[in-house]
């Protein structure tokens, strides 16, 4: 678990799959992602199982959670992909699937936590993000 001021990043769980399906089938959420919709529960389960088979040093997807009252609410996912340990690079990815949490700074906090994790704990030299020029939130 990676703790921030108002958020935490945790390993994804099988119980998260229904949220993934809902998010990945929402065109507003996926408009800047390279994802083909519609996605089924079975497709997300297969993706999840593939993530479990991947060694953590090759990249990992983490759930973004915010604390509301006395519970943590899963609002999105972030991760490092295509980790190259020889060249010490990785691609960064993030999605805030719960639209009620857009434009509140949670994505920026999650980004900072993942970058810190990548540089300080994985000893990476370069972390990059491919961004559509029409995605202003990703460029902040």
Where are these regions (language model features)?
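Conserved acetyl-CoA pyrophosphate-binding loop and the N-cap/start of the following alpha-helix
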Residues: 101, 105-114
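Conserved GNAT acetyl-CoA-binding A-motif
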Residues: 120-130
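GNAT-family acyltransferases
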Residues: 1-100
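Conserved G/P- and acidic residue-centered "switch" motifs that form tight phosphate/ATP-binding loops
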Residues: 72, 105, 135
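Core alpha-helical elements of the protein kinase catalytic domain
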Residues: 112, 116, 139-140
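Conserved active-site alpha-helix within GNAT-family acetyltransferase domains
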Residues: 108, 133-140
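Conserved hydrophobic/aromatic "anchor" residues
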Residues: 12, 117-119
């Amino acid at each position: 678990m990676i703790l921030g001021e108002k958020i935490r990043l945790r390993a994804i769980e099988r119980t998260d799959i229904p949220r993934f399906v809902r998010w990945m089938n929402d065109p507003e959420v996926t408009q800047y992602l390279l994802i083909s919709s519609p996605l089924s529960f079975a497709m997300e389960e297969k993706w999840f199982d593939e993530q479990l088979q991947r060694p953590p040093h090759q990249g990992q997807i983490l759930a973004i959670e915010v604390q509301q009252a006395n519970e943590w609410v899963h609002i999105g996912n972030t991760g490092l992909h295509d980790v190259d340990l020889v060249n010490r690079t990785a691609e960064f990815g993030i999605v805030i699937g719960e639209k009620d949490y857009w434009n509140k700074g949670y994505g920026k906090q999650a980004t900072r936590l993942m970058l810190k994790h990548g540089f300080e704990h994985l000893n990476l030299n370069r972390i990059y993000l491919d961004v559509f020029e029409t995605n202003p939130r990703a460029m902040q």
